[in-house]
């Protein structure tokens, strides 16, 4: 009986201390990003595809819709409009190009620069993940999450 109490006590101690010592979950991996050289090429692609303008125009459209729907005054609409900062969304764009190598990016850049029709139906306006991220970004802007106080 005495040995049974010792084993029960040891079992309880093991059940309490092993989970406390071991790490059961780790932090998620950071999002994939292209190399510095590839970021330069991606920036050129963004410029050639006029995607920065697309992001800002999309956000302005969402702001105008919310302003009309909720009856914002001019000051609030202006404050929210001024909070649009493309740099807050740039990492989402870099992420979709993270798995392209330099040759693929250069080929894509040449296609954007050469064919203006290609710019309107480009990977950035047809990528569902990026469009979803853009929609979330625009909603956050409308909610005022990027207003600096």
PLM features: what roles do these ranges have?
Residues 6, 15, 148-149:
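Extended, non-catalytic scaffold segments that flank or surround catalytic motifs
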Residues 27-79:
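Early exported N-terminus immediately downstream of N-terminal targeting peptides
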Residues 2-10:
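Bacterial N-terminal signal peptides that target proteins for export
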Residues 10-19:
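Bacterial N-terminal signal peptides
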Residues 22-24:
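Boundary at the C-terminal end of the N-terminal hydrophobic targeting segment
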Residues 70, 75-149:
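Compact alpha-helical subdomains of small soluble proteins
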Residues 14, 52-53, 87-88:
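Short secondary-structure junctions and interdomain/linker hinges
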């Amino acid at each position: 009986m005495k040995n049974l109490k010792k084993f029960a006590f040891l079992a309880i101690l093991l059940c309490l201390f092993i989970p406390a010592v071991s790490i059961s979950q780790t932090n998620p991996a950071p999002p994939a990003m292209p190399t510095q050289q590839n970021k330069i090429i991606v920036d050129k692609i963004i410029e050639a595809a006029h995607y920065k303008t697309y992001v800002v125009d999309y956000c302005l459209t969402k702001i105008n819709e919310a302003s009309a729907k909720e009856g914002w005054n001019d000051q609030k609409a202006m404050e929210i409009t001024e909070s649009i900062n493309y740099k807050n969304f740039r990492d989402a764009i870099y992420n979709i190009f993270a798995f392209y190598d330099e040759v693929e990016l250069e080929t894509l850049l040449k296609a954007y620069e050469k064919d203006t029709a290609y710019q309107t139906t480009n990977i950035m306006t047809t990528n569902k993940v990026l469009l979803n991220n853009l929609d979330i970004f625009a909603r956050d802007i409308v909610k005022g999450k990027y207003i600096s106080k």
